[in-house]
Regions:
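N-terminal positively charged amphipathic segments used for targeting/anchoring
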Residues: 1-38, 49-50, 54, 64, ...
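Terminal hydrophobic membrane-targeting helix
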Residues: 30-129
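Generic beta-strand hydrophobic packing signal
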Residues: 42, 89, 136, 167, ...
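Solvent-exposed beta-strand sheet faces enriched in polar/charged residues
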Residues: 45, 92, 168-170, 219
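Soluble non-cytosolic domains of exported or imported proteins
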Residues: 50-54, 66-74, 140-148, 191-196
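Solvent-exposed, polar/charged alpha-helical surfaces in well-ordered, non-transmembrane soluble domains
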Residues: 54, 58, 74, 78, ...
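Short secondary-structure junctions
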Residues: 82-87, 156-163, 209-211
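Extracytoplasmic segments of membrane-associated envelope/inner-membrane machinery
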Residues: 99-188
Length: 230
């Protein structure tokens, strides 16, 4: 072996590579454990409208303490997303001693039963809110569908001049609407067919003058039933 230059060169290269790897691992371990690189600043880079800065600071302080290189970025992000009104959070290291946090807040679109809110993406979330919002009621998992349908209902009902304040989707997939003026509209389960019926009803109701209805049933294929106010 000792008189074989090729083997000697190969062995030397292997030893050099092993030494470099060991040094790299040692340096990495030192960087992770060293107190020379503390996180000094945790900065929220986005303006906040609903998120409590106090709650967010408490989360960030707990997960961001310690070494710049060892900061638990994924855990910090996941914890920040548990703070009320936070939809998404992203965290990045900024050399030499800063963590930058970007927050995307939920935008409340409706109330969901008595349990929470629905955002503009049709996602349910829990957060306090005193805003005047429409009420959605439906089976778990139907939030996005109700949000999508709500926009169509609002457009169709606009000529009536009364806001749509409640949308109910039953467990059997039956739809029911209520306007701010008290008018209740039953669409039934075939909501696609009911779209045309709702349009026809709105046109007829707008022409009816002084007639004021309490309840409208649109489940009939060739017409609708109306209960008027006495």
């Amino acid at each position: 072996m000792w008189d074989n230059p090729r083997l000697l060169n190969g062995a030397a290269g292997f030893l050099v590579g092993l030494t470099v790897l060991a040094c790299t691992l040692a340096a990495g371990n030192w960087l992770l454990r060293s107190s020379l690189f503390p996180v000094r600043v945790v900065e929220v880079s986005t303006p906040l409208e609903h998120v409590s800065r106090q709650d967010l600071r408490a989360v960030l302080a707990h997960y961001a303490a310690g070494n710049f290189f060892a900061a638990r970025i994924d855990e910090l992000r996941a914890a920040a997303e548990q703070v009320p009104w936070v939809r998404r959070a992203s965290v990045r290291r900024v050399w030499p001693d800063r963590l930058e946090v970007a927050i995307e807040e939920h935008v409340a679109f409706a109330r969901w039963g008595s349990e929470g809110l629905v955002n503009t993406q049709g996602e349910r979330f829990a957060a306090p809110s005193g805003a005047a919002l429409p009420l959605f009621i439906g089976p778990p998992g139907s939030e996005a569908e109700i949000t999508r349908r709500y926009a169509r209902f609002v457009e169709t009902l606009a000529p009536l001049g009364s806001p749509l304040e409640r949308v109910v989707l039953s467990a059997r997939h039956g739809w029911q609407l209520r306007l701010a003026n008290g008018l209740q509209i039953t669409l039934g389960r075939d909501v696609d067919a009911a779209d045309d019926r709702l349009t026809r009803f709105v046109e007829a109701y707008a022409r009816s003058g002084n007639v004021r209805a309490d309840v409208v049933d649109l489940r009939y294929p060739n017409g609708f039933a109306v209960r008027t106010r006495g």
